[in-house]
């Protein structure tokens, strides 16, 4: 009798252990996506799109936060934060896949691959950018792109995808040599969805976009670039590939990299449209979860907060609706490039362009003081003595910075910096084992909990 009872208890425990092991794991990382970015998007979703339901991530049953400090700073960079989320180890800013004393540490993706999981990583920026690189590379500096790609070629993952490689920003010839190395290590290298669909791809794919604005950017959602690859399409392509080559179990990381780029530029409208698009990518995984609810885990978080974005500003609109946001038809980056291309514009021509692209004077009221401020800076820009606003990814005319400062103020959106902050970031989860993420997390705990759930620890 006692023996039978022990056997029954043992069988029950084994059943619980088996049930607690997710087979399909999705980790979504909104680069730079603080709670302010999420709430601005939720406000837009509710007041402009008139949706009664919250954005999908905010519907998940687990909602928590994570601290993001690095080993050497209260304010992390993407390399240290990516390493924390990938490996469960704190490191110094700029370091990839290593401890502060330069000891290489494996990511959960590498460990899961060794246990037979398929692995896919996709991003809206370069596939060798800091966050995705932290899952496969081990380098002392995030800018060591050739070395990062050497690690990538040997990682054995099933899908790496993004806008392109940072190496191509300096040398297309070196980029081709890097692609050849991936091919030599068994990857099928494709440029665009058409090539992917036509290729008889093997188990490993390196995907780059043939419509990318730069090798580090597929393009902003707000710019509505005709025919441009979207992160939602890339997420679907990666998922389809994993279902084909590793149908029994896989791990997938999706990074919304353009959220960070837009936030560095303090482009409130672009941030909201990027987070809204990121939510569509989450929907791809959620639809899969609905088919496999007892086997799937979805986690959503961010590597850090960029910009310190807020809904509400000093002396801003008393009744924030964000309805003006749909007047914005161009990102701050593209508007800046537009200004550079049209240096011969008169002020009246620029006013007409701002009316068309931003809604100024037509749908968004501009007072005399605001117009005078913009015109003064516009005149300096035409005379080439305009000061510039420098951020991590872009250098803007002061005129552009002033225009978008006024635009954000009209929205009721504020920013505290063009850099990162030390603010905690949101954590949302649903599915098998999601309850593990319900308490306040340190970012290193997220991969540690995935290890525990998959019996890697």
For the regions a language model picked out, list residue spans one by one.
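Hydrophobic h-region of N-terminal signal peptides that target proteins for export
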Residues: 10-19
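Residues that line or immediately flank small-molecule/substrate-binding pockets and catalytic motifs
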Residues: 12, 126, 164
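Glycine/charged-rich beta-loop-alpha catalytic/anionic-binding loops adjacent to active sites
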Residues: 92-94, 263
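Positively charged n-region of N-terminal signal peptides that target proteins for export
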Residues: 1-4, 282
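Mobile, glycine-rich extracellular loop/lid and propeptide segments
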Residues: 23-40, 85, 90-91, 99, ...
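Surface-exposed patches in mature extracellular/periplasmic domains of secreted proteins
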Residues: 97, 105, 119-124, 191-194, ...
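Short coil/turn segments at secondary-structure boundaries
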Residues: 3-4, 73, 96-103, 136
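A post-motif C-terminal structural segment
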Residues: 23-24, 33-39, 43-83, 129-133, ...
């Amino acid at each position: 009798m006692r023996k039978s009872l022990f056997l029954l208890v043992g069988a029950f425990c084994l059943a619980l252990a088996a049930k607690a092991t997710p087979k399909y794991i999705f980790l979504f990382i909104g680069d730079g996506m603080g709670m302010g970015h999420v709430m601005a998007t939720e406000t837009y979703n509710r007041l402009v799109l008139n949706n009664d339901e919250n954005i999908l991530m905010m519907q998940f049953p687990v909602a928590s936060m994570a601290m993001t400090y690095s080993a050497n700073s209260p304010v992390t960079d993407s390399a240290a934060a990516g390493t924390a989320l990938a490996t469960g180890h704190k490191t110094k800013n700029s370091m990839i896949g290593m401890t502060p004393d330069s000891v290489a540490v494996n990511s959960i993706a590498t460990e899961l691959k060794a246990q037979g999981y398929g692995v896919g990583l996709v991003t809206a920026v370069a596939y060798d950018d800091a966050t995705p690189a932290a899952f496969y590379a081990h380098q002392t500096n995030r800018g060591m792109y050739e070395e990062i790609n050497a690690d990538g070629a040997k990682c054995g993952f099933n899908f790496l995808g993004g806008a392109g490689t940072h190496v191509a920003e300096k040398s297309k010839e070196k980029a081709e040599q890097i692609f050849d190395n991936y091919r030599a290590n068994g990857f099928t290298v494709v440029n665009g969805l058409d090539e992917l669909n036509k290729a008889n791809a093997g188990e490993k794919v390196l995907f780059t976009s043939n419509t990318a604005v730069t090798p580090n950017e597929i393009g902003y959602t707000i710019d509505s670039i005709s025919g441009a690859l979207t992160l939602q399409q890339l997420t679907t392509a990666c998922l389809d590939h994993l279902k084909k080559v590793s149908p029994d179990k896989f791990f997938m990381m999706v990074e919304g990299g353009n959220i960070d780029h837009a936030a560095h530029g303090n482009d409130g409208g672009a941030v909201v449209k990027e987070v809204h698009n990121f939510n569509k990518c989450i929907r791809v995984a959620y639809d899969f979860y609905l088919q496999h609810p007892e086997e799937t885990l979805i986690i959503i978080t961010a590597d850090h907060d960029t910009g310190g974005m807020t809904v509400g500003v000093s002396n801003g609109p008393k009744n924030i609706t964000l309805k003006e946001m749909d007047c914005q038809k161009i990102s701050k980056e593209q508007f800046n490039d537009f200004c550079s291309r049209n240096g011969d514009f008169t002020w009246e021509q620029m006013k007409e362009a701002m009316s068309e692209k931003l809604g100024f004077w037509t749908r968004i009221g501009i007072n005399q003081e605001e117009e005078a401020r913009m015109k003064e800076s516009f005149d300096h820009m035409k005379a080439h003595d305009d000061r510039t606003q420098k951020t991590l990814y872009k250098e803007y005319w002061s005129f552009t910075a002033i225009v978008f400062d006024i635009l954000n103020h009209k929205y009721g959106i504020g920013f505290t910096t063009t850099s990162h902050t030390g603010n905690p970031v949101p954590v949302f989860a649903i599915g098998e084992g999601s309850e593990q993420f319900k308490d306040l997390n340190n970012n290193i705990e997220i991969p540690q909990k995935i290890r525990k759930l998959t019996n890697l620890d």
